[in-house]
Amino acid sequence: EIDLILPLLDKKRKVSQIHYGGGTPTFLPALELKELNAHVSDTFELIENPEKAIECHPGWMTGQDWEKLATAGFNRFSIGIQDFNKQVLQTVHRQAPLLQPEEIVTILRSCGVRINMDFLYGLPHQTEASFAETIEKAVSLKPDRLVTFSYAHVPWAFPRQKVLEKTGLPSGDEKSRMFEAARKILCEADYQPIGLDHFVRKDDELYTALLNGQLHRNFQGYCTRRTTGQVYAFGVTGISQLGTAYAQNTKDIME
């Protein structure tokens, strides 16, 4: 697909960020991801030291998997924790991490990569106190970035979400209190808020961009470069952004 689309792209435009996500790409073997990274590097002109990020499902990855992935060319890992509370994870049918979070962080730090942690609030069995406990544990692990996403309950779009209604979901007011509790903990730990849901350490490039008036946002989220308003997406359901226009790939893998 990359080779098919390449003739239509601006060959003078340098690529500054590469992101594997919109799902859980770590179901692919590390060797295949390494080969794909190499093909992207050979195909596009990259800036010096571009960001190469990948979203990871810790419920599927062993220590060896983390180590192999860290040597596959990635320099930023987004770990989809969602919650440290086992009851919450079981209710939403989310596999708990195979390794203790401390082990994962130790492995990645030894490989010299940057670490993001993603959390969801508004899930069944979550309370203000339980989510605060999760965020406090996250802070103790000292990730470079921490993101608190609000769970969007849209069963008409994703019918499998309907089953969560049997357990019950937190109200809007309860979700607001969860977020405010998390925000308070993060700010007291000297994490800096970026927009609505990102919190970063003071040495993070997003915070530097915010201070310098160079923070931007594209379809993927916050970024430090205006040029990332151009997003070339590949793969099933991938969404490209070309200036103010968007285009989405088919959701049918056979198509």
Label every model-predicted segment:
Residues 1-8, 14-255:
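C-terminal scaffold of the Radical SAM
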